[in-house]
A protein has these predicted regions:
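Phosphate-end processing signature that detects enzymes handling 5′-triphosphorylated RNA
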Residues: 1-178
Length: 178
């Protein structure tokens, strides 16, 4: 049984952009129930994409069950086209390996489409109490806010959040607020 322990943060400023060129990720959900999600993903450059299917359980604190399997890219593309709920979640993911920041690897997601403007960093940890180095571009923790779950960004995209709230978050991301 696989267990994912993940913490999620807003990202401030733009220094993180230089860390990695990133890869395009397109993902959709076959199920987005609170107790379980089934996600299909295509990641990589066109023609060199990799497909995956992931089943996740309900989140408890910062952990949940997660089962992730590679599938043929053509199968993932067909599922995204024919079966996935709409809209798809699209983002550019940048990876910061543990060698560059002591502790654990970071993934920084810059959302596109209906979630454009939102930038979130995630770190997977070996246990819930694990310590880690907080890079200067790390903003407010949003691990316990379900609005930031990718599956929830499908039904409630960032672009549809109340304008005042969205603008406050965008100011945080730009580094204009604390």
């Amino acid at each position: 049984m696989a267990k994912e322990i993940e913490r999620k943060f807003l990202v401030r400023g733009c220094a993180w952009r230089a860390l990695d060129e990133g890869e395009l990720i397109r993902q959709g959900y076959l199920s987005d129930e609170k107790a379980r999600t089934v996600r299909v993903r295509l990641a990589g450059k066109p023609g060199k994409e990799k497909g995956s299917i992931t089943v996740k359980g309900i989140t408890s604190g910062v952990s949940r069950l997660e089962f992730d399997y590679e599938i043929p890219a053509a199968d993932a593309a067909a599922m995204l086209e024919r079966l996935a709920l709409r809209p798809l979640v699209e983002k550019i993911r940048r990876r910061v390996p543990a060698e560059r920041l002591p502790g654990a690897s970071w993934e920084i997601d810059e959302f596109l489409g209906e979630n454009a403007g939102l930038v979130v960093a995630e770190i997977e940890l070996p246990d819930e109490g694990a310590s880690f180095v907080r890079p200067g571009w790390l903003g407010r923790e949003v691990s316990d806010d379900p609005r930031y779950f990718n599956s929830n960004l499908l039904a409630h995209p960032f672009g549809a959040w109340p304008e005042a709230e969205r603008q406050a978050i965008l100011a945080e991301i730009r580094g204009e607020a604390d």
